[in-house]
Structures are given as structure tokens and as C-alpha cells.
């Protein structure tokens, strides 16, 4: 389990950040202004905003006051705003799964074998609908992250005291383990919070069809017969229109870029694939026509 956890923790995504042309100094070609970087799946995109802005600052219009912002920087994928409060890998898995057959064809036609997620940096005084405003940069992200851990701790244990009782030193070490990509420290503290037999499992299901939405079901550790609940059990209960006993699945479940087998016990999946915010993020992605044909064989 430790080896798989480490692989999940080390996962990164190649990203290219372009800039909304309206933010560029007159005369600058938008195609000439990009930032390329690798962002960990197990991190928040906005943790990298300062690094991105440092590379772009000289190309941006002077109307933007970087010290006393009266607006907000945010990112979009093909015009769709990306909510910063979800781990980056979960955003990627769900957003590129909107129409995988088209994206698969696009990748086949690409000369490069490297998959790069192309995003756009935007700035506005009014926030996109549903997006949590950021007014305190990294400090606010840290507070939100700790809130998520308290919520997940309550789901797991029926109380948040395991998180609330962390010393200030351990709380700071916990947060810094994400910023510094310190796998050992992260799990050393996380495993003090996660019980061997939880009451429920912290879970977020990311759907992009028929509309973008997040579902947070109440998932028991065991079914009514005392058997560990599997991924399939949960899906048939929460998403019966997509996953049923008799029909070939029209979608697949992806976490950290890995397609998850339906028969995997849900808590075993959580132990191996939980994200930095203590939740198990599952992205529901439509299967391609070719995949549907293979599944029926």
C-alpha cells in the first residue's frame, strides 16, 4: 500500500498557462506569453499563482495592482472556470473527461507524446459564479484546507477532535508537507486522524454531465450484511442512471489519473487514493465508443 500511496502522491500534470488577451500590454502577442510548469495532482492550483504571476508580470497591463487587489485571478479551461478549492488532479480528471472520444482523437493527431493541459489565466472584479473568493492568498487556502480536514475527520470518526487536538507545530508541519511535497510527514500526521475502521468515508464525486456538479454521498464502511462496501455498491446507489447491475457501464471512475476497478472495497480505495484535503475524489468520465464495444465482448 505504501508504494501505491507514494505513486499517487508523486503524480504531476504538465500545464501550460496562457493569458486572457485583455490582460496583456498592447502589442504583445498572446501566443508568445505562456508559462509551462508541472503541478502536483495532490495540491491546489492557486498555491502556484505567485510563481505564475512572477513569470507574467512584465506582460500584464498596469491596471492590475498586485499588492492591493480589488479583483481576483482565476483559471479557466476552454472557457469553464476552475474552482481552486478542489485538488488539481481531481479538476483535471473530471474536466478532460467531458468528451474523452474527441480528446483521444486530438491526442492521436498531436506530434508530441507529452500530454499538456492548457489553461487560461483571467482577472476580474466580479468572481465567476460559484467560485470562493480569495482575499488572503495562501493563508486562506490553508484555512480552507484545514476546514476540509475537520469535516473529513468528523465523517470518519463522528468527531473532529483528532484534528482539533493537533498541536500548532503539527498543524503547521501538516500544511507545509503539502507545500514542500513531504510525503513522509503528510502521512505520519494523516494516519493519526484516519481510523482503521471508519464510521463513514469522506467522498466527493465529480460529474461533468449533464452538468458540472459535485456529489458528497454518505458512504458507510460496511453494507447491511457487514461486508466492506465496494465502489460498485456505492455507484449503483448514488448514480443508478449511470451504473446498474445489468447494463454495460457508460462511464468509468478515475482517481489520480487511474481507472478504478468497480469491485474495489471503498475504504481500501480511500486509504490508497485520498487527496491532500482528506477526501477521496472520484471523477466520472464517459467511456468512448471503442471502450463500449470492448466491454461488450
From Swiss-Prot:
<dbReference type="GO" id="GO:0006995">
    <property type="term" value="P:cellular response to nitrogen starvation"/>
</dbReference>
<keyword id="KW-0832">Ubl conjugation</keyword>
<keyword id="KW-0472">Membrane</keyword>
<comment type="subunit">
    <text>Conjugated with ATG12.</text>
</comment>
<keyword id="KW-0813">Transport</keyword>
<dbReference type="GO" id="GO:0034045">
    <property type="term" value="C:phagophore assembly site membrane"/>
</dbReference>
<comment type="function">
    <text>Involved in cytoplasm to vacuole transport (Cvt) and autophagic vesicle formation. Autophagy is essential for maintenance of amino acid levels and protein synthesis under nitrogen starvation. Required for selective autophagic degradation of the nucleus (nucleophagy). Also required for mitophagy, which eliminates defective or superfluous mitochondria in order to fulfill cellular energy requirements and prevent excess ROS production.</text>
</comment>
<dbReference type="GO" id="GO:0000423">
    <property type="term" value="P:mitophagy"/>
</dbReference>
<dbReference type="Pfam" id="PF20638">
    <property type="entry name" value="ATG5_UblA"/>
</dbReference>
<comment type="similarity">
    <text>Belongs to the ATG5 family.</text>
</comment>
<dbReference type="GO" id="GO:0120095">
    <property type="term" value="C:vacuole-isolation membrane contact site"/>
</dbReference>
<dbReference type="InterPro" id="IPR048939">
    <property type="entry name" value="ATG5_UblA"/>
</dbReference>
<dbReference type="GO" id="GO:0044233">
    <property type="term" value="C:mitochondria-associated endoplasmic reticulum membrane contact site"/>
</dbReference>
<dbReference type="GO" id="GO:0034274">
    <property type="term" value="C:Atg12-Atg5-Atg16 complex"/>
</dbReference>
<feature type="cross-link" description="Glycyl lysine isopeptide (Lys-Gly) (interchain with G-Cter in ATG12)">
    <location>
        <position position="150"/>
    </location>
</feature>
<dbReference type="InterPro" id="IPR048940">
    <property type="entry name" value="ATG5_HBR"/>
</dbReference>
<dbReference type="Pfam" id="PF04106">
    <property type="entry name" value="ATG5_UblB"/>
</dbReference>
<dbReference type="InterPro" id="IPR007239">
    <property type="entry name" value="Atg5"/>
</dbReference>
<keyword id="KW-0072">Autophagy</keyword>
<dbReference type="GO" id="GO:0005776">
    <property type="term" value="C:autophagosome"/>
</dbReference>
<dbReference type="GO" id="GO:0140355">
    <property type="term" value="F:cargo receptor ligand activity"/>
</dbReference>
<dbReference type="GO" id="GO:0061908">
    <property type="term" value="C:phagophore"/>
</dbReference>
<dbReference type="GO" id="GO:0005829">
    <property type="term" value="C:cytosol"/>
</dbReference>
<dbReference type="GO" id="GO:0051365">
    <property type="term" value="P:cellular response to potassium ion starvation"/>
</dbReference>
<dbReference type="GO" id="GO:0008047">
    <property type="term" value="F:enzyme activator activity"/>
</dbReference>
<keyword id="KW-1017">Isopeptide bond</keyword>
<dbReference type="GO" id="GO:0032258">
    <property type="term" value="P:cytoplasm to vacuole targeting by the Cvt pathway"/>
</dbReference>
<keyword id="KW-0653">Protein transport</keyword>
<dbReference type="InterPro" id="IPR042527">
    <property type="entry name" value="Atg5_UblA_dom_sf"/>
</dbReference>
<dbReference type="InterPro" id="IPR048318">
    <property type="entry name" value="ATG5_UblB"/>
</dbReference>
<dbReference type="InterPro" id="IPR042526">
    <property type="entry name" value="Atg5_HR"/>
</dbReference>
<dbReference type="GO" id="GO:0034727">
    <property type="term" value="P:piecemeal microautophagy of the nucleus"/>
</dbReference>
<dbReference type="Pfam" id="PF20637">
    <property type="entry name" value="ATG5_HBR"/>
</dbReference>
<dbReference type="GO" id="GO:0019776">
    <property type="term" value="F:Atg8-family ligase activity"/>
</dbReference>
<protein>
    <recommendedName>
        <fullName>Autophagy protein 5</fullName>
    </recommendedName>
</protein>
